[in-house]
């Protein structure tokens, strides 16, 4: 009889989120990619530090790289501490990389990180979105829809 899984395997800890990306882009498809990190970067992320607000991903040399993601230096790190905004390699299957490369090159799409998290096994992952940029009028429509939904819920709450 197999041992039951520990409760820690079911938990997902979100470290950084790019909430602005869902407003600025039409999200076509999402991918889960592994993140190649050094030891001090992992420790820094486990403390909840890190930002992907200005980050993006690019396909270069048959690999996908996360660029401009800020993982601050580990406070207790020594001389082997990492560089805060260095490009970090993302781990994807080859067919996924080829698909992303084709979409970015031909269709004018962008690769945007939506969140960085630790999965149930404790591995650092990035939720990567294949997205198309919104125009200003699209953003206005999104704001109107959001306000209308908020107003509807307010009306229903007051009524009931």
From Swiss-Prot:
| Disulfide bridge partners, by residue number | none
Q: Name one GO cellular component term.
A: cytosol
UniProt cross-references to InterPro entries, sorted A to Z = SmpB, SsrA-bd_prot, SsrA-bd_prot_CS
Keyword Cytoplasm present in the record's keywords: the answer is: yes
Q: Where is the composition biased (Basic and acidic residues)?
A: 138-160
Write down the superkingdom of origin: Bacteria
Entry function: Required for rescue of stalled ribosomes mediated by trans-translation. Binds to transfer-messenger RNA (tmRNA), required for stable association of tmRNA with ribosomes. tmRNA and SmpB together mimic tRNA shape, replacing the anticodon stem-loop with SmpB. tmRNA is encoded by the ssrA gene; the 2 termini fold to resemble tRNA(Ala) and it encodes a 'tag peptide', a short internal open reading frame. During trans-translation Ala-aminoacylated tmRNA acts like a tRNA, entering the A-site of stalled ribosomes, displacing the stalled mRNA.
Q: Protein name, please?
A: SsrA-binding protein
């Amino acid at each position: 009889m197999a041992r039951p899984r520990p409760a820690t395997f079911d938990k997902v800890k979100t470290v950084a989120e790019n909430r602005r990306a869902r407003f600025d882009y039409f999200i076509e498809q999402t991918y889960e990619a592994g993140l190649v990190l050094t030891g001090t970067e992992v420790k820094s992320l486990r403390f909840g530090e890190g930002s992907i607000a200005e980050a993006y991903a690019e396909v270069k040399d048959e690999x996908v790289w996360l660029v401009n993601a800020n993982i601050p230096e580990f406070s207790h790190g020594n001389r082997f501490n990492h560089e805060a905004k260095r490009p970090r390699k993302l781990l994807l299957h080859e067919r996924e990389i080829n698909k992303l490369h084709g979409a970015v090159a031909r269709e004018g799409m962008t690769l945007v990180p939506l969140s960085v998290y630790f999965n149930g096994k404790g591995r650092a992952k990035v939720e990567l979105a294949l997205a198309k940029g919104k125009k200003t009028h699209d953003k206005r429509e999104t704001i109107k829809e959001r306000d209308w939904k908020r107003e509807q819920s307010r009306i229903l709450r007051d009524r009931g």
